[in-house]
Amino acid sequence: MSKPTREEAKEAVRTLLKFIGEDPSREGLLQTPDRVINSYVEIFSGYGKDVAEILNTKFYETCNFRDFILLNIKFTSFCEHHILPFNGTVDIAYVPDNCIVGISKLARIVNIFARRLQIQEKMTVQIAESVQENLKPLGVAVKISAVHSCMSMRGVMQDNSVMNTMHYTGIFAEQQKYRHEFLNLTAKR
């Protein structure tokens, strides 16, 4: 599949404006196609980014503790089914084997996956598996809690529903005590 030109993308926005009954040539909408394309370039900037590059800088001398937990990483993504936003928080824990990364690296991983068309379940797995693959810890736990606009703005119109997804690898998948500790910590916020 070849990538459309910027002009083709702008024409697609004009077509959508016509589809909803708007006039793309009216004053307030003249610059809308450009603005939408510029927004999409930023919003969907996670494509083509390499998680391995982000996790390339590791610290080996500081791995004398048991758990590493980063809570409440905020994100906004877009559901691949309706291209509507969903936003929430990500909690990540891992038990280092021989290395750690700076905490900003975990937030960057979340941003890479959030800045793509997504479903929450897949994003949860992608984050956990990327940490597992690149850091090779004893285990990883990821929990995402999010509110989905596709449920609040259309369809069932449920604006207070929060979806929680979790994915575990290694000792978090194998040992209930690790999962329990992680879930207790994430529930205390």
Curated annotation (Swiss-Prot):
Listed GO cellular component terms? Answer: cytoplasm
Stored SUPFAM superfamilies: Tetrahydrobiopterin biosynthesis enzymes-like
Keywords carried by this UniProt record: GTP-binding, Hydrolase, Metal-binding, Nucleotide-binding, One-carbon metabolism, Zinc
Sequence positions that bind Zn(2+): C79, H82, C150
Per UniProt, what is one GO molecular function of this protein? GTP binding
Give a yes or no for keyword Cell membrane in this entry: no
Which reaction is catalysed here? GTP + H2O = 7,8-dihydroneopterin 3'-triphosphate + formate + H(+)
Name a single GO biological process.
Answer: tetrahydrobiopterin biosynthetic process
Under the heading Pfam families, the entry gives: GTP_cyclohydroI
Q: What is its EC number?
A: 3.5.4.16
InterPro entries for this protein? GTP-CH-I_C/QueF (IPR043133), GTP-CH-I_N (IPR043134), GTP_CycHdrlase_I (IPR001474), GTP_CycHdrlase_I_CS (IPR018234), GTP_CycHdrlase_I_dom (IPR020602)
Pathway(s) served: Cofactor biosynthesis; 7,8-dihydroneopterin triphosphate biosynthesis; 7,8-dihydroneopterin triphosphate from GTP: step 1/1
Query: EC class of this enzyme?
Result: hydrolase
NCBIfam families in the record, alphabetically?
A: folE, PRK09347.1-2, PRK09347.1-3
- Which family does the record assign? Belongs to the GTP cyclohydrolase I family.
Q: Which PANTHER family match?
A: GTP CYCLOHYDROLASE 1, GTP CYCLOHYDROLASE I
Record note on quaternary structure = Toroid-shaped homodecamer, composed of two pentamers of five dimers.
Family matches, as HAMAP family:
FolE
Q: What is this protein called?
A: GTP cyclohydrolase 1
| Organism (species) | Rickettsia conorii (strain ATCC VR-613 / Malish 7)
